[in-house]
């Protein structure tokens, strides 16, 4: 199991010299996250690779996943099955792992299953980033920037959503109309 995990980590781009540290962290994540080594390794490598992180960040990523599990109504096993579908989109728009974790905590805590949360968050990010969408038009009108440009310039996802909420409030619409 350990040797397979090391092989999987190295195959996914982790440095051979750091494989022992990586596998040790994956083992800890598997135990604390109610999952198996394969899922832990896959989730960690997917996250590190998508965000361009080095192996020295594996502990930070693992801690963030455990925190998401502890604060939300999800498990690392459920996150592991879903994150791979969302992280590429989030990374493309410069939405941080911290912001993704907060979104998962909020949605799962409110009774939305992890897989469904993934679909909702992914759709939201794509809608915000899609040229010509109502949300994109509002962001451009209010800031002169696209969603990607706002995220690249240091805005947080919460700040971007607040711009839309403010517009909804001032126009008497709901966020769903944005």
Set out the residue ranges of the language-model regions:
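Amphipathic alpha-helical interface segments used for oligomerization, scaffolding
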Residues: 1-178
């Amino acid at each position: 199991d350990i040797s397979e995990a090391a092989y999987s980590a190295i195959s996914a781009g982790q440095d051979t010299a750091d494989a022992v540290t990586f596998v040790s962290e994956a083992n800890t994540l598997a135990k604390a996250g109610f999952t198996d080594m394969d899922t832990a390794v896959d989730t960690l490598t997917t996250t590190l690779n998508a965000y361009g992180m080095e192996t020295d960040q594996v502990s930070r990523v693992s801690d963030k996943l455990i925190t998401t599990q502890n604060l939300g109504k999800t498990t690392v096993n459920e996150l592991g099955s879903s994150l791979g579908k969302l992280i590429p989109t989030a990374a493309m728009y410069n939405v941080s792992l911290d912001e993704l974790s907060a979104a998962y905590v909020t949605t799962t805590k409110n009774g939305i299953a992890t897989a469904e949360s993934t679909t909702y968050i992914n759709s939201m990010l794509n809608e915000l980033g899609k040229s010509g969408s109502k949300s994109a038009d509002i962001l451009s009108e209010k800031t002169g920037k696209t969603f990607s440009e706002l995220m690249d310039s240091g805005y947080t996802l919460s700040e971007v959503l607040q711009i839309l909420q403010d517009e909804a409030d001032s126009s008497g619409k709901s966020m769903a109309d944005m």
